[in-house]
Amino acid sequence: MNNLISYKKMPLWTAETLPEPFKKMHNTKVGTWAQLHILKGEITFEFLNEDGSVSDTVLLNATTPIPLVEPQQWHRIAKASDDIECYLEFFCKKEDYFAKKYGYTKTHSEVLAAQPMIPKGRVLDLGSGEGRNSLYLASLGYDVTSLDWNVPSLQKLQEVAAQEGLSLEVDPYDIECADIPGGQYDWIVSTVVLMFLHEEVIPDVIENMQSHTASGGYNLIVAAMSTEDAPCPVNFPFTFKEGELLEYYAGWEILKYNEDFGELHKTDENGNRLRFRFATLLAKKG
C-alpha cells in the first residue's frame, strides 16, 4: 500500500445499514483497491472467481489483518454479525487520485511517462483546462503555473487545489497572444492544446514556449495531426503535418518523438473513440 493513497471513505455501516449490493458478487473498478475497516463485530468475507465460485474465505474482525481487495477482484460479504460496525475505504495510485476523487480526466499518459526524468522545478501547464496535469505535478512537489483562457475551468482548478492544500499559480491567458508571463520555466507542458489554435499563430506560440524555457529545461507537446494515411476526423483549426513539429525543435535534444495513433475521449456516432495520429515530442533545451 506504500504507493496507494485513499480517495474515498464510505459511511459507517451496521447490520441494518450494510448495503445489499455488497452482500452479492461484485468487483472493484479498474485502478481501485478497497479495504474494510471493522470497528466491532465480525464479517465472513469471500473472494470469488469469475464464475461465482469461492476461491477463499476469511473471517474478519477488529483485530485481524484486513486484506486489500485488488482492482476488478470479485468478492462479497457473505455474513455479518448482528453487532457489526464497519466502513469501506477506497485507494488508488497517485496518478489516478484526481480522476477518482473529483471526476477528472486522467493525467495525460505522456506527462506520467516524462515526469520521472524531469527534476523538480518550475512547470508551466499551457492550456491547463481544469488541471488534470497541473494538480498531479503540484502534488509531487513541482512549482506549477496553470494558464488557460477558460475561466470556469481555472476556477474549478483553484477550488480543488484549495481542498487538497496545493499551491499553484493560476491565471487566465490567451495562448494565441504568444506572450507567456512569469519568466523562465524548467518544463513547459502542452497536451492536446495546440490543435485548438489558429494555424497562423503556431510558429509564434512555439517560439514563445522555447524562449521561456530555461537552459536545460524541457518542452512536452502532444497535438493532433492530419496525414494522408489518417486524415483527422475532427475539424480542428490546426493539425500538424508529418515531421512538422520536429522541425521546430532543431538544435534541441530530442528525448522522444513519434507520430503514433491515439484517441480522443470524444466518440463518433457509434460510440467509438475518435482515433488518428498525434505528434508527441519531449525535447530538452541545450
Segments from the language model and where they lie:
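A short SAM/SAH-binding and catalytic strip from SAM-dependent methyltransferases
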Residues: 187-201
